[in-house]
């Protein structure tokens, strides 16, 4: 899994011009799945995201997790995180997970994370418009492939 984690003051996702979900302070996640992903990747990502300390404490140090600040998560599926750009000028997305597998993993990821932190989600495969107010900005890329190699 590849997940872009953005610390936000607020974020929302709209479909057909109507807001589907919105959150206040927390994380906006862009979640990509590949066919090689497994429950290991899913569990690793959930644990890392729930415990990642990138919110400022009273001393202005990044020392608090999304749980600590009682934040929320907006999760958006994004197969384009697996774009291959080595050849030509049009990206290939063949490395992205097959839709039926990716959707199941994405939904399981959201359900698992929601047991720890409030999670709202976009619609898998939909054309969505995402608005956010970055906080920092702080943007982190989590790639579970590295953890899988070292497991």
Curated annotation (Swiss-Prot):
The EC number(s) attached to this protein equal 3.1.1.96
Checking CDD domains in the record gives:
Dtyr_deacylase
For this UniProt record, the keywords arranged alphabetically read as follows: Cytoplasm, Hydrolase, RNA-binding, tRNA-binding
In the record, what terms sit under GO molecular function? Answer: D-tyrosyl-tRNA(Tyr) deacylase activity; Gly-tRNA(Ala) deacylase activity; Ser(Gly)-tRNA(Ala) hydrolase activity; tRNA binding
What residue ranges carry the coiled-coil annotation? Answer: none
Catalytic activities: glycyl-tRNA(Ala) + H2O = tRNA(Ala) + glycine + H(+); a D-aminoacyl-tRNA + H2O = a tRNA + a D-alpha-amino acid + H(+)
Superkingdom in the source lineage: Bacteria
What InterPro entries does UniProt report for this protein, alphabetically? Daa-tRNA_deacyls_DTD, DTD-like_sf
**GO CC annotations?**
cytoplasm
Record motif Gly-cisPro motif, important for rejection of L-amino acids, residues: 136-137
Q: Where in the cell is it found?
A: Cytoplasm
Its principal location?
A: cytoplasm
Q: Which GO terms describe its biological process?
A: D-amino acid catabolic process
Q: Which HAMAP family match?
A: Deacylase_Dtd (MF_00518)
What is this protein's function?
A: An aminoacyl-tRNA editing enzyme that deacylates mischarged D-aminoacyl-tRNAs. Also deacylates mischarged glycyl-tRNA(Ala), protecting cells against glycine mischarging by AlaRS. Acts via tRNA-based rather than protein-based catalysis; rejects L-amino acids rather than detecting D-amino acids in the active site. By recycling D-aminoacyl-tRNA to D-amino acids and free tRNA molecules, this enzyme counteracts the toxicity associated with the formation of D-aminoacyl-tRNA entities in vivo and helps enforce protein L-homochirality.
| Subunit description | Homodimer.
Q: Which family does the record claim for this protein?
A: Belongs to the DTD family.
Q: What does the entry's free-text domain comment contain?
A: A Gly-cisPro motif from one monomer fits into the active site of the other monomer to allow specific chiral rejection of L-amino acids.
* Protein's recorded name: D-aminoacyl-tRNA deacylase
What organism does the record attribute this protein to?
Lactococcus lactis subsp. cremoris (strain SK11)
Gene (name only):
dtd
């Amino acid at each position: 899994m590849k997940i872009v984690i953005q610390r936000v003051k607020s974020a929302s996702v709209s479909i057909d011009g109507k807001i589907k979900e919105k959150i206040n302070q927390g994380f906006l996640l862009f979640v990509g799945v590949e066919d090689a992903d497994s429950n290991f990747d899913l569990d690793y990502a959930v644990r890392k995201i729930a415990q990642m300390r990138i919110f400022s404490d009273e001393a202005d140090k990044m020392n608090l997790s999304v749980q600590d600040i009682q934040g929320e998560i907006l999760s958006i599926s994004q197969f384009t995180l697996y774009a291959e750009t080595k050849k030509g000028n049009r990206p290939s997305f063949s490395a992205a997970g097959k839709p039926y597998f990716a959707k199941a993993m994405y939904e399981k990821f959201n359900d698992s994370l929601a047991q720890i932190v409030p999670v709202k989600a976009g619609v898998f495969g939909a054309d969505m418009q995402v608005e956010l107010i970055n906080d920092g900005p702080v943007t982190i890329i989590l790639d579970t492939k590295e953890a899988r190699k070292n497991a």
